[in-house]
Regions:
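N-terminal Rossmann-like NAD(P)+-binding subdomain of aldehyde/semialdehyde dehydrogenases
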Residues: 1-93
């Protein structure tokens, strides 16, 4: 069965994610584990640059992320914007 993200306000499907086979899921888990092995060996100074960049991208796209949070969780748009900005600040720290 596919997974659906549903807007709690109007019941409309925001996005449908296809069901994965056991093999597909195992492959994704293996990829994540391999990425972690690389990440944990990355110096903190380089990780900080990467995470800060994620914060910059989040800040640059705050309205896009806020809209998505509103659609998926029924949050008020201004509340969602505030949460996105707060999260971006944490990443920048």
């Amino acid at each position: 069965m596919a997974y659906e993200s549903v807007n709690p306000y109007d019941g409309k499907t925001v996005k449908t994610f296809p069901e994965l086979t056991d093999e597909q899921l195992e492959a994704k888990i293996a990829t994540a584990a391999a990425c972690y092995e690389t990440w944990k060996k990355t110096p903190y100074s380089k990780r900080a640059v990467i995470v800060a960049r994620a914060g910059e991208l989040m800040r640059a796209n705050v309205d896009k992320f806020a809209k998505l949070a509103t659609l998926e969780m029924g949050k008020l748009i201004n509340e969602a914007r505030g949460e996105m900005s707060f999260s971006a600040n944490i990443l920048a720290y």
